[in-house]
Amino acid sequence: MAIVKCKPTSAGRRHVVKVVNTELHKGKPFAALLDTKSKTGGRNNLGRITTRHIGGGHKQHYRLIDFKRNKLDIPAVVERLEYDPNRSANIALVLYKDGERRYILAPKGLVAGDTIQAGASAPIKVGNSLPMRNIPVGSTVHNVELKPGKGGQIARSAGAYVQIIAREGNYVTLRLRSGEMRKVLAECSATIGEVGNSEHMLRVLGKAGANRWRGIRPTVRGTAMNPVDHPHGGGEGRNFGKHPVTPWGVQTKGKKTRHNKRTDKFIVRRRGK
């Protein structure tokens, strides 16, 4: 994998920094594992905007990723690594011994030809998935389940990982990248290693159009709007003279947004503390 800075042949290329991975498959994806992906433009079924800054972008197919890793004790060979436009991580096409193919998240260090396996008896090896009760304390894992059998929900983006720091009874304690420490059932499965493509954060798009290709529309500051459009709008100069709020008047700095009290007991330490 290489970090390539483009030559300044135009204003739009001057600041572009690309992440080039020569190991990625250059052909088409595996058709049987593709699904349609329709554009919403950020609108709901009433045609009202529910998520701002969404619209346009290149047409894409969704890749069906196996987050559950529920083909147990059947070895699989990594056929190739592929680019996935729907996520920051790369994906790997694996062929199981029984002939079935699936996509999985490509962990760091996994290459074509490697053998992986899922199940309680799987060895501690990058790409293998097993219950966290069987993973040594101190190990780095990704694609971590919150409920047994539901599929991985934590640490799925490029370069993400979670560290197992303790095991007590039916629970393991995890340290997340945010600094949060939380308990999860030891029966939940996780995949050994960290998610690959960690250089993703180093890329520089270089121009506004590159975001438009990705379906991301501009974000306009509230203070640049009129009073009818935003609480920060209007007035002389750039000062809006009040506490920062969202377009709907909700405080935007320091206000807690978590409401799930039922699972508060599993959080040992909050993030950022």
From Swiss-Prot:
It comes from the Bacteria. PROSITE patterns: RIBOSOMAL_L2. It holds the Pfam family Ribosomal_L2_C. Residues 221-273 are annotated as: Disordered. One of its GO terms (cellular component) is large ribosomal subunit. GO terms for molecular function: rRNA binding; structural constituent of ribosome; transferase activity. Keywords: Ribonucleoprotein, Ribosomal protein, RNA-binding, rRNA-binding. One of its GO terms (biological process) is cytoplasmic translation. Residues 253-273 have a biased composition (Basic residues). Part of the 50S ribosomal subunit. Forms a bridge to the 30S subunit in the 70S ribosome. One of the primary rRNA binding proteins. Required for association of the 30S and 50S subunits to form the 70S ribosome, for tRNA binding and peptide bond formation. It has been suggested to have peptidyltransferase activity; this is somewhat controversial. Makes several contacts with the 16S rRNA in the 70S ribosome. NCBIfam families: rplB_bact. HAMAP family: Ribosomal_uL2_B (MF_01320_B). Belongs to the universal ribosomal protein uL2 family. PANTHER family: LARGE RIBOSOMAL SUBUNIT PROTEIN UL2M (PTHR13691:SF5), RIBOSOMAL PROTEIN L2 (PTHR13691). This is Large ribosomal subunit protein uL2. It comes from Glaesserella parasuis serovar 5 (strain SH0165) (Haemophilus parasuis). The gene is rplB.
